[in-house]
């Protein structure tokens, strides 16, 4: 038998690879070059064919007829239009396509939807996808309308959307896009200026659908609830999305997760949204969310929860920056309500305002929130609880946190209302009760962004003895950086607790009383008002009578100066001989 030439064998392998994933018999069909209309091309096409559409406006009801086809506007959506002309139909229909189909490169406009089972209900103004596997890319859905899914409605399908724009569409549910059952992955797309009279101005998903949203923008959308988006009995993920300038008359200006929804959420920018409750986000009715590494800023609630409105959930909010939000009633930053135990960790809650109470946070009606390593700073209210307010059987636990520089008519830092109780564990707080063993008031030394300075009293004052403490801070810095965890959302380098060497009584000057304090500490077991490390004039790691003698020598005989920090207060720079634990205010 003769052997095949190697060159022919290689050519055969190359051709096989190039044709892989597409039927070798598939054809490209040109519109209008070969066929006058898209539907004429569909009628004769077979599974796997591509219909390549030249620039122009096509007023057709494009029905894939159950075929696995790619319909492509070859010059893109700027030049290729599928126009429903306001007829009572969707512009495009994909139904019962079990392998895959694709729509790419079109502006789909002026559609009105088709009947979708319920009386007087129309679905998918621009595109309807039913029981199909479909890919939609590089398309714009413009000025379509229907009952569900003004731009696109997907039902019991697996749909992938990328590089698309949903602009100025309208529906009762899901102005830009709605998904009922099945799955939807949407990436690098925009929902802009869509409107819903009901749920989800930009995007609605329900029916236990699986939703994954990546790198998308939801801008200037409006709805009754969930101005930007509304997830109800859905699961999945949202990541790296901009949610800005959306509006809801009820809950969730930026977006609303409700009715047993379960989502992993990260990297959101939720900015300048408005709603009655939950100007930025609403999380309600037994949803379970893990929201991390996001910014919630500049949102407004006409009632409760300027940044986030949390109602009956067990969600986790971690590494969030909740800043500059406002509420007309309670909870400028966060409003946590009713019989849940949300977890708030490594969060910066800064510069929020509520008119009535709880400028930073309000906890009400039996909620048992847990705050771990949070900084609640510079919030305000005209009522009680500039930092945090609890009332009506609420029982928040606050661990390793800072409550500082908040402002209120009464009870500026923390306000405990009727039938409420706080559990405070290692908290630096304005207005701290000196009788509270694990709470203290010293200068947190925070900058305008909530970061502690090198002399902050929050440094090294945290406890490790609490279950489930986060491993890193809000910026991903490992904890601890010193001997113990720092309080608040940020972990700082060093050991904090600046002092003046030789200032044994902590009055920030070196005088004869410091020598007497050393002697009292050594011979009468008296406490020092400063930290013991400051009493160690020689910085040799021990407090002895020599330290008292050297203080006297410096004062009266022009003797040698003490070791650093001197002559100005600062942190200990010699960690070999330091006793930073002697400066701790709170025990373990």
Residue ranges and their predicted role:
Residues 468, 494-588:
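Cellulosome-associated attachment modules in secreted, modular CAZymes
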Residues 61, 65-69, 135, 156-165, ...:
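Predominantly extracellular beta-rich ligand-binding scaffolds that present long acidic/polar faces
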Residues 34-39, 47-70, 76-80:
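N-terminal extracellular ligand-recognition/capping segment immediately after the signal peptide
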Residues 16-23:
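C-terminal segment of classical bacterial N-terminal signal peptides
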Residues 1-10, 20:
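Bacterial N-terminal signal peptides that target proteins for export
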Residues 435-491:
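C-terminal accessory segments
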Residues 102-203, 207-224, 237, 246-249, ...:
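Right-handed parallel beta-helix
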Residues 33, 68-118, 432-433, 440-445:
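Right-handed parallel beta-helix/beta-spiral solenoid domain characteristic of secreted/periplasmic
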